[in-house]
Amino acid sequence: MSETKPAANDLSNVPSASDSDKDNSLDKVHSLEKTGVHEDINKLPSSDLEQLEDDGREPTLEEMKKLRHISEKIPLSCWLVAIVELAERFSYYGLSTPFQNYMQNSPEDKPKGVLHLKNSGATALSYFWQFWCYVTPIFGAWIADTYTGKYNAICIFCGIYLVGILILFITSIPSVASYNTSLGGFIVAIIIIGLGTGGVKSNVSPLIADQIPKTKPVIKVLKSGERVIQDPNITIQNVFMFFYLMINIGSLSVIATTSLEHHVDFWAGYLLPLCFFCIAPLVLLLGRPYYVKVPVGEQVIARSFRCTYLAVKNKFNFDAARPSLHPEAGYPWSEKFVEEVRRSVYACKVFVFYPIYWLVYGQMINNFVSQAGQMELHGLPNDILQAINAITIIIFIPICERFVYPFIRRFTPFRAITKIFWGFMFASSAMVYAGVLQHFIYQQGPCYEFPKECAEEFRQVPNRIHIAIQTPAYFLIGMSEILASITGLEYAYTKAPVSMKSFIMSLFLVTNAFGSAIGIALSPTSKNPKLVWTYTGLAVSCFIAGCLFYIIFHHYNDKEDELNQLDYMEEDEVRLQPITSITESLAAR
C-alpha cells in the first residue's frame, strides 16, 4: 500500500489493532462519520485511521491492478435517457420489421403486402432504408457537436421522427390511400423517419454516457473493511450494457407489430409505434432539469478535419499539426486536441471491416423474412422470428458478463479486438446455417427451387419445412451482436475526445450505411434459385473479413490502456472521464 498522508491529529501514541478487530473498528468509523462525532475517531486504532484516510484518494497503478473495481451510483438522468432510447428503438423495430412484407407482397398474397415489389425489389429498398438510417447520423452528429448540443438535437430529431411515422400510418390505411399514394407515402415516410432516427441515434448514446460524473477512480473503504476502487469506468460499462439491453427490449415490439400486421392490417402495426414514440419527447421535456448538457465545441469537427488533413499530407504524421512544433502556423487548437484527433483516427481504422458485418446482419430484416415466407408458418407471421434475436441478446448479455467473460479471462485476456473477431465468426456461421437451410427448402416440394412460383395451384403453398428450423440463424446473429456490435459501440465512444463523441459515434454507425450500399448492389441476386449461393458468398466474405480484421488490428489490444490514459489528463481544470475497455472490468461488477 502506498504511503498515506499524515493524520490531522497526533496519533503517535495510539496502539495498533489486531487484524481480528479491524472490521468492527472500521464499522465504528463509518458509524461515527454518519453521526458527526469526529472527536471519538482519535480513539480508534491507527491502522483503521490509515484506511479511513485512504477513502477518497487516487489509487496507485499497483492498486488499480490489484483492488476490486466497483461502480458509482447511476444518476437518474441516465435512466431517463435510456427510456428515450427504449421508445425510439421500440418504434424503429416495430415499424421496420413489417417493411419486407409491405414492400414485397401484394394484398392478395400470403403473407399479405401492399407494394408488390417482389423479393429483389423489396430487398433493394430495404437496404436503402438501412443505408439512409445509418448515413444520417453524420448530419445529426454535426448539428449536435457544432450548433445545438446533444440534448437539443435529440429533441429536434424526435419531432421529425414523429412526422415521418404519422405519414407512414396515414398512407397505410386502405380506405385513405391508393397504391400510388401508398408507394409515395412510404418513400417519403422512410426518408423522414431515417433522418429522425439518424439524428437521435448518433446523440443518445453519447448523451447517456455524458451523465456520468467526470471524476477519476478513487479508493473507497467498504464497511466490511475491504479497500476497493470506485471507478467511473465500471459505471459507464454498466450504463452501456444497460443501454444496449434497452435497445433489445424495445426491439421486442416486433412481436406486437407483426401480430397486428398479420391479424388486423399494416396500419394497426404502424399505429402502435406512433403512440409509443410519444413517450420520448415527454421524457425529454420532463427530465430537462436533470440532464447534464456538455457545451458545444467551437468548430470542433471542422478543426479536426483540418488537423487530420495536415497529418495525412505528411504521411499520417500528426506532429505536422502540433502547435508546439509549428508556432508560426498559429493553429487554433492545443496539443491535447491533436492527441485526441490522433486517437480518434486510430480508432476509426478498426471500423473499416464493419460494412461486411452489417451486410450480413442486414439479412435478418430482409432475406430471412423472405426465407421464412417460403416455409410452413403454422399460423405465425413470417417476420415474427426477429424477436429471437432480441431475446437472445437479452438473455446472453448478463450470462456473458457474469460467467463467460470472467471464465475466459482466467486463461487469457479477452479484449475488444478479440471480441469483435468472434462477432464476425458468429455472423459468418449464421450465413452458413441460412445457406444450408435454404438448400433444404429447395429440396422440399411442392415448388422446390421456386417456392410459391411454380404452378398456379401452388402459388400460395409454401415448401414443406417448418419455420422453427430458422431459429438458430437468428440466435447466431444475436450472439454476433453481443460480441461485435456492443464492443464497436463502446469502442467508438471510449476512443473519441469529449468534444467529438457524437461525431465519432456517427462514423461507427455510418459503416452500417456502407454495408447497406453493398447490399443494394447485391440485391439482384436475392431471388430463387440463387439464394444458396447468396448466403454462401456472405459467409465466406464475413469469415475472410474477420480474419483480416484480427491480423491487422490484434496489436491494438496491447495499446488499449495507453490510448485510454488520455482521458485521465486534465486541461483548463476540466476533468475528463477515465475509460477502459468493457472487457477489462466486467468480472469486477
UniProtKB/Swiss-Prot annotation:
Family statement: Belongs to the major facilitator superfamily. Proton-dependent oligopeptide transporter (POT/PTR) (TC 2.A.17) family.
Coiled coil (residue ranges): none
A Pfam family of this chain: PTR2
InterPro entries per record: MFS_trans_sf, POT_fam, PTR2_symporter_CS
Annotated localization: Cell membrane
Residues linked to a glycan: N233
Keywords: Cell membrane, Glycoprotein, Membrane, Peptide transport, Protein transport, Transmembrane, Transmembrane helix, Transport
Record GO terms (molecular function): transmembrane transporter activity
Species: Candidozyma auris
Positions of region (Disordered): 1-56
The keyword Cell membrane is assigned to this record: yes
Topology versus the membrane: Multi-pass membrane protein
Name recorded for this polypeptide: Peptide transporter PTR_A
SUPFAM superfamilies: MFS general substrate transporter
Role according to the record: Peptide transporter that exploits the inwardly directed proton motive force to facilitate the cellular uptake of di/tripeptides.
